[in-house]
Amino acid sequence: MSAEAGRFAPGPIERRKRLVERAAYVCLLLTTAALILPLLGILAYVVVKAWPVLSWSFLVENPKNYMTAGGIWAPLVGTFDVVVLSLAIAAPIGVLAGVYLSEYARENWLTRLVNLAVVNLAGVPSIVHALFGVGVFVLMAGFGRSIAAASCTLAIMTLPVIITSTTEALAAVPFAFREACWNLGASRWQTIRTIVLPNAISGILTGVILQVSRAAGETAPILFTGALFYVAVTDSGVASFFPYGLRDPFMALSYHLFTISTQVTGASDALAYGTAVVLIALVLTVNLVSIVFRVRLRSRRKW
């Protein structure tokens, strides 16, 4: 019996491998904890500081008494409007551009140059996009400081990532699917519409939805192109979800958080932390929605 046990006992090389494996596991676990625990600590701290003002009235009331009381209805509605409008502009243009670059454009120096420009534009700081929006949309296009100028600026800022995510999602679809469809007599567009896009939709939607959270959290582009310190809107109601005209300035959560934290005297810290909690909750909700979409759509794949 002891001979059998000795025969299958791990040797020094095997013991060393197991030791390295356990050490790697512990290191990865500690690294993950070092990333997650500070985030949870920050989130808990912000929620505790915001707790005195977190209520339904905080969401559905306008700021009052020179921004020292009330809620965040006007900034919340402004953020909703500008994000929806920017997404309505950027999503179709970005997806169509990604489809063209992936499925129609020939592989040459011009295509490589365009792809390189798209990748580089994704890393341009938001303040540069803000200055571009001022020059093009506020001044040249004549929109003025308005929700239209801010939405167009955010759309330009989010376009590169949407294009990139679309091209990568389309490239992930096996080329054999296209060949099989072509052999059955389908045209290029029929192949894209019925085979390629349905199999790439999870990656495309993930890229689009994640840009919603980015647009909702940006401050510089809207600060330069349309966000104001205070704009009164009608309190809660279905009609008040779109109180702004395209040429009207607006309030936004990110800029509202900045102003009450740095420019308003007499405002309690709870108001600023409450605004931060709502903004964080909005971003987390969008990210969770993108994860759910991706998981559910990928589960339908047959490959």
Give the predicted meaning of each segment.
Residues 7-30, 45-86, 107, 259-270:
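Periplasmic/extracellular loop-to-transmembrane helix junction in inner-membrane transport proteins
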Residues 70-100, 208, 287:
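Transmembrane alpha-helix signature in integral membrane proteins
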Residues 73, 77-82, 118-122, 171, ...:
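Alpha-helical transmembrane segments of multi-pass membrane proteins
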Residues 89, 95-108, 115, 144-196, ...:
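Membrane-cytosol interface at the C-terminal ends of specific transmembrane alpha-helices
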Residues 39-51, 133-139:
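A structural signal for multi-pass alpha-helical bundles of membrane permease subunits
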Residues 63-70, 222-280:
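Interhelical loop and adjacent transmembrane-helix boundary motif
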Residues 101, 167, 171, 175, ...:
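C-terminal transmembrane helix and the adjacent membrane-cytosol boundary/short C-terminal tail
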Residues 119-156:
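Generic hydrophobic transmembrane alpha-helix motif, especially the helices
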